[in-house]
Curated annotation (Swiss-Prot):
O2 binds at residue 247. It comes from Strigomonas oncopelti. Its main location: mitochondrion. Pfam families: COX1 (PF00115). Keywords: Calcium, Copper, Electron transport, Heme, Iron, Membrane, Metal-binding, Mitochondrion, Mitochondrion inner membrane, Respiratory chain, Translocase, Transmembrane, Transmembrane helix, Transport. The keyword Heme applies. This is Cytochrome c oxidase subunit 1. Its cofactor is heme; Cu cation. GO terms for biological process: electron transport coupled proton transport; mitochondrial electron transport, cytochrome c to oxygen. PANTHER family: CYTOCHROME C OXIDASE SUBUNIT 1. One of its GO terms (molecular function) is cytochrome-c oxidase activity. Component of the cytochrome c oxidase (complex IV, CIV), a multisubunit enzyme composed of a catalytic core of 3 subunits and several supernumerary subunits. The complex exists as a monomer or a dimer and forms supercomplexes (SCs) in the inner mitochondrial membrane with ubiquinol-cytochrome c oxidoreductase (cytochrome b-c1 complex, complex III, CIII). Pathway: Energy metabolism; oxidative phosphorylation. There is a cross-link at residues 243-247 (1'-histidyl-3'-tyrosine (His-Tyr)).
């Protein structure tokens, strides 16, 4: 009973971070098992390991994508490593809203439970991890599995938003006097930028999937062409979240690598200020390139030229980061010890 209360009711940032890491790693193993079934099915001609059940193959693809994105990668970085290390690196005793931190973890658990419920309900949700209409519309998937999936996305998104608000409150409200923003490690900067990305993009995704629920259950026609809706509206809303999601995943890793370089090399990364500005620039440009995921839908030439050009621009701040890391590696004596 003591251990159950310690885990379930704990408000310690370290305990919550470890719970996030443990659950997310288990979810990662589950997603990996799904990917093995997908590869086995593709490697066999004719009826494979799924015995010709094409719907269940689509369910596996959907669950694998959603689990890996929402239940593995994001919780490992923002829920696990950020929760555990940001207060330690900042000199704070804990996060500014400890109970909100605990609430975000249990909302994450509830979202994962809703996702598993969608997997096990009737024939499952064979809609793809992007959840495009018309596959998710009631005419093609009338079961409650799709509703469970949308509800899971809502819960997982709210969990990430609460976690991000907690992080922003911790960094800005608990900042010590005379402690400059430039004194933050690059991992803290990466976590801050990622939290802002989550707060901006997740409500857009939530709005898009809420309209899906309305189409399925309340006879609206936001994505029904016959009723005056637009199928591409959901794609724009989804990829406005989906492309910054790439940077939500990678920017904390940028900061983590920079911090590892500093620790192993016993010196600051070359041009830390440029590293901060490059992460900020990557995040800003990431909001203006979402439609390069939609080139096949028939956009005009000017639109494709714009999104393609801005996509190329993201390579510039990325090159700055790679140059600074390379320079730090070349002119630093790293100490890496391997124990027998």
């Amino acid at each position: 009973m003591f251990w159950i209360s310690l885990v379930c009711l704990s408000v310690s940032h370290k305990m919550i971070g470890m719970c996030y890491l443990l659950v997310a790693i288990l979810c990662g193993f589950l997603g990996y098992i799904y990917s093995l079934f997908i590869r086995l099915e593709l490697s066999i001609i004719g009826c494979g390991v799924l015995f010709g059940d094409y719907q269940y193959y689509n369910v596996l693809v959907t669950t694998h994508g959603l689990v890996m994105v929402f239940a593995f990668i994001m919780p490992v970085m923002m829920g696990g490593l950020v929760n555990y290390f940001v207060p330690v690196l900042s000199g704070f005793p804990d996060m500014v809203f400890p109970r909100l931190n605990n609430m975000s973890f249990w909302m994450f658990m509830g979202g994962f439970g809703a996702l598993v419920s969608g997997l096990l309900t009737e024939e499952g949700m064979g809609i793809g991890w992007t959840m495009y209409p018309t596959l998710i519309c009631v005419d093609f998937h009338s079961s409650l599995a799709c509703d469970f999936t949308v509800f899971a996305v809502h819960l997982l998104g709210v969990s990430s938003i609460l976690n991000s608000i907690n992080l922003l409150g911790t960094l800005f409200c608990c900042r010590r006097k005379f402690f400059s923003f430039l004194n933050w490690t690059l991992f803290i900067w990466g976590s801050l930028i990622t939290a802002l990305l989550l707060i901006i993009t997740l409500p857009v995704l939530a709005g898009g999937v809420t309209l899906v629920l309305c189409d399925r259950n309340f006879n609206t026609s936001f994505y029904d062409v016959v009723g005056g809706g637009d199928l591409l509206l959901f794609q724009h809303l989804f990829w406005f979240f989906g492309h910054p999601e790439v940077y939500i995943i990678i920017i904390p890793v940028f900061g983590l690598i920079s911090t590892m370089v500093e620790v192993l090399g016993f010196r600051c990364v070359f041009s830390s200020v440029a590293m901060i500005y490059s992460m900020i620039l990557i995040a800003i440009l990431g909001f203006f390139v979402w439609a390069h995921h939609m080139f096949v839908v028939g956009m005009d030439v000017d639109t494709r030229a714009y999104f393609g050009s801005v996509t190329v621009l993201i390579g510039l701040p990325t090159c700055i980061k790679l140059f600074n890391w390379t320079y730090s590696f070349l002119y630093t004596d790293f100490i890496i010890a391997f124990e027998a």
